[in-house]
Each structure stands twice: as structure tokens, then as C-alpha cells.
């Protein structure tokens, strides 16, 4: 038998991991199956140690469109660069496995997750981390796993592990948790304003549920795992200089340099201090071996700097900018700095500054999605930009980095929870967060700036959202949670814990751990401290914009909505789209849905209103009893045609013109006359008979026409078959009594005179004047 399969139950469904069947030449290879979702996950490390000073780990998440029976929509009809969802899925796996590689490990390592089958209900993004943990565990790559990953939803107050796609639509949260047997490693969450207690409960629930998966991977490692290869952790000579440099740096004023206010000034003082110490060891930079020694001393000074900063935080509750552990940096906000944008705001917190800009568009502006999900488009876009000048650096600028995509997605999830529905606010919304300065928490600055720009644009948010980044410094059992961390604290600390939400609860959360994991107690403390910081920031935001503006920006587009009878959609479109083109020529775009919802988009409010009025007129449905101020548009021998509203005429019969007998319609009405009319009857074909309201009850109404088709009852002449008797003779072709026929040879039709009126009548009153032919009602 080829391959070996290991199974366990997870969320009431079987999870199976198979190895030894596919991709057998790689160091570690498994297939993960959950329902009908199937993934191939491989792990491979290079044989040689790289010279890089960081862990060269890459995680790729490959979506194959054949997994859902689709052909890619690209020009070449093949998969191209990974989409946003694939990148976010890869980041989930990366953040779970990265902290567990041994210190000093520098072998280039690659984990590739390929989606082979997707059933549309069991999401592959949380199965990829399980496959990565299994592949690394059974491979010869040094790694301190295993880990596991699960998704948790909350439906009707109950936690649900790995909810299906359908269940997620009813869930109050979408929480992804990864961890080891002992602790939580990674958390990512989007929620509909849930409490901190609900979040902690869900995280603990997830950690308990993943234990069966961890046990399964441990069993795999015991039965089919390979021995880990030995690697040489190149410590270098830097560690030899740390003790001596520590004493010299403290004596030279390291503490004061670390506590210097301002990122640039602090960096300059620390650099000057470092260079001064190095000169004592390397008097001649051009001498042989000086470059290697200088680099070793720089590395050693970095370790000294990190240790002293952590000591100040733990022992003295002092941070690099002089704050204590719970204080938020000073905040400055400006609303509507951009005069022509639909909504804009600048949010500055310490030395982190973000320009948030909101743009409103139509359904035609929604982004199209071509991935393995059933989603076809997204009407809310949030783009996070991190240019090199924000940190005072020079770098090559290209496409969006994975970091930018991840930070933007977090801000997007935070704000999406408070957006109105598309039915309530029928705009496609794009928010851009341009980071202008960065010294920590730029993604949280984007949440605040984006929220303010939405409020400035007049988007009716359910509540304002703010975000704050929390940090952690931990030495053994001693730890301290930090509010609103600096970039330096992010780099030298042990946790980056971002929390976003309203005054009522959390809407998004992301946690990355650099140590072996944190306990629920630390997480509770971090969430409680984050709430204090979030409420403080919301208060500062309310001082500038307490609520969304009552009106849209003058530069914002105008969108009007109305509902029409779906059967009348064709009238709005017109033959060959003629009517829609005429509407768009009035300065507006029109979209029509199958349920009859019509949306009008225009840069001008007047144009939008004019198009709406035109559509309402075209689709207006007349009702019996309604009165109108109509206009005579046509005169016929039997009556007058009166326009009630655009596209709809009615017929006012000659018998309804006056209490006295009228011989000639033109004696009473002419084309262009205005008069009040009332709808007396609408037949099965939609033809309208009118009366004059002032004559109602004074003039007998016409009898309604017999419906077309079906049984029409006996004819006036009874049956047409049999002997009808002789025809009446007429001496000329002049007028004849109603119902009379002229004599003609059998089988020969009587030709209509060239002067016969073009007007057609559907029925004829007994008191109508005689006519040379029997006219039919004109449509």
C-alpha cells in the first residue's frame, strides 16, 4: 500500500493527513483532507547555511482553479501571481511556524501549500498551517513544533470550531487561532463588535479543540518522522564583546541615549555612542580584519541596546520616549485636509502619521474576485501604502508587499464591521491609508485615519473605530504589557498585539508572538489595557468629528435608488438599450438589478434627480380611479387620446366629452389642450378608458371591452354559420347604418378608401358617428 493515513475528528468532521504518496522527493510532504477540501503541503530546506542575518523562510499558498472546476479568467487562462486571499493565507501559516525555528538557523526553507480540491464549505486557509506543521514535523528540518490551527465562530452565543462557509455568514466572529500544546502562538480575528471576554473565551476554546490535531501530528512524527539534521549556529565573535561593551556603554550614557525623545535624535545619539565605543577597539578602520571586527562590535552593541531597553521597561517602567507602560502618545488630528477628496483626514500619534482618504463610487467600481471562493466582487476596498520616506529611507518602489497587504486587510476588517449595508448606502467605498511617518502602529493609525475620512465623507458608520498596538516584554515569569508601542519596542519586544474596535467592543484583532507563546492571563491583561487605550483614542477623535457629517461632500457623487416593477425593466432599457443611452446622455450612469432595483449615479445632484424623474415617469403604472392633468395629443372621430404621463396615453371617448351629444370631437377639443381626466377602466391589454371627473355620474359610462381570447360569448348576429338571409341593399357607398355591410361578389374583399383615417379604435359606442370603415383602437 502506498502512503500512510492518520485521522482524527475536528468539529464533528474527519480530518485526515496522508504522507508517502505524493511528492516523495521532498524533505516533508503531506496531503490534508477535510470534507472534500484537499491540500498538498511540502517543506524543503537547502543543504547549505546562508549568509543572511535573518531566518530565510518563505511560505507560498498556491490556488489551482481546477480545485473548483474553473478555468482562470486571465488572458492566458492560467494562474498568475497569488491573489490577496492567497497571500493572507500564506501569512497565517508563516506567522504560526516562524517563531519555532531554532535560534541561529539560517538554511533557506520553503513551505508550499497547493490547493488541489475545494468544496466551498471547508476553508483551506486553516488547513494549510496544519499541513505545514505536519510536513515540518516529519521532515529532517529542525523545528520545535508541532502546532495546529483552527477557526472559531460564534453562532447564537455558542462557539463553533471550523464553521462552514454558510455558518460563517451567521457568525458574530471569524477567529483564527494557532498554537502549540502549551500556548497560543497566533491570533487573527474579524468580528461584529464582540466583548473582550467573548474573545478570550473563544481563544481558550480554540486552544482546547486543536489538541487532538497536535496529538495526531506527534503520532505521525513518532511513526514516520525523519531525524533532524544538525546545523551550525554561527554565533560569531559578537557575543564575546557583549559583557565588556555593556559596562562601557552604560558608563558612556546608554540610558540617557535610549530615553532621548524623538526617533531621529535618539538614533543619532545611539549611533554616536556606538561609533565612539568602536573607535576604542578599531583605531585604524583600514587595517586588515577591521571590517569584520567593526561588524562584530556593531552586532554586540545591538544586543547591549536591546538588553538595556528591556531592563528599563521591566524594572523601571520606563520606555524609550519617557512614557510608562499604559500611556498613549500625543494625538493630533485634522479633518478634510484635501479640498477635492470625498472625505479625508490626517491622524498623527506621536511620530506615526497617516493620511486617510475616502472615495465613493458606483457598483461598476467594485473589485472583481477570481479565486476559489463563490464571491464575485467586493464593494469595500481598503489600500494601505507604506512608502520608504515614511521611515526616512531610500528604497526601490514596486508593487504592494505582503506586509502592506496584511496590514491593509487588518484595517479593512476593523472598519467593515461598522459600515452600513449596500442597500442603506449604495456606494462602493475605497479607503486609502498613506503612511506619511512611521514609528510604530502605522496599521492602527490607518484604522483611525480611515474611520475619520469615512465620517468626513458622510458615510453613516454605526460607530467610530480606533486601533492600538500592544507590546510585551517578558523575561521568565516577569513581564510587562505596553500600550501604543514604538517601532523600537516592536523590534526588541516579544509580541505585536493589535486590537481595533468601538467603544462597545472589538471588531478586529491580530497577534504575532516571537516567543514560545503566551498564556490566557497575559492575553486578558493585554485586551483590558488595549480597551483603555482605545477609549482614549476614540475620545480624541470625537473632539474633531463626533459623528459622520450630515451631508456628503460637495465633490462626492450622487446616487439615488428606486424600485420598479421587474416586468417594466425592459421599458427602462429600451429597444437595443436606447432608453438607457438617453438616460446616460443626461449625465448619469444607471444600473438595474433583476429584482427591479435601479440605482442612478451622477456627479450632479440635478442630473441624478432628472434621470430619476424620467425613470419614474417611464415606469409609472396607471390605476383605475387616478386623476391626471392630461394633454390632448391626438384627435380621432370617436374621441381624443390624452397623454397622462410620459409613455402612457388614454382614450377619452366622444360620448364622455359633454352632457350634450357631440357630433365632432374637434368642436370640443384640439391637440395641445389641457384637461382633467380620470381613469375609468384598464383592459387586459393595458388600454385605458378615460372620463372627465366633472361629468362623472352625469354621462353614462362606456361598457368595458370584452377581453381578448377565450370564450367571448355569442355574437350579435348569433352563429355565423347557416343562412343569414339576404343582405340589405344600398344605392351608394356613402354612410350606412352601424353594423351594415356593403354587397360584394363572394370571395372579394372590399378595399379600404385611401382617405380612411389612420386612427384605430378597439370598440365603438352606439352614439358614435358613422364611418366609412370600422376603425380599431390604436396602441
From Swiss-Prot:
Q: Which Pfam families match?
A: KH_1, PNPase, RNase_PH, RNase_PH_C, S1
UniProt cofactor(s) = Mg(2+)
Q: Where in the cell is it found?
A: Cytoplasm
Query: S1 motif domain: from which residue to which, for each copy?
Result: 625-693
Q: What class of enzyme is it?
A: transferase
Residues that bind Mg(2+): 490, 496
Give the catalytic activity: RNA(n+1) + phosphate = RNA(n) + a ribonucleoside 5'-diphosphate
Question: Where is the segment annotated Disordered?
Answer: 699-779
Q: Does the keyword Cytoplasm apply?
A: yes
One BP term from GO: RNA catabolic process
Q: Where is the composition biased (Basic and acidic residues)?
A: 699-752
Q: State a GO cellular component annotated for this protein.
A: cytosol
* Name of the protein described by the UniProt record: Polyribonucleotide nucleotidyltransferase
Q: Which organism is it from?
A: Deinococcus radiodurans (strain ATCC 13939 / DSM 20539 / JCM 16871 / CCUG 27074 / LMG 4051 / NBRC 15346 / NCIMB 9279 / VKM B-1422 / R1)
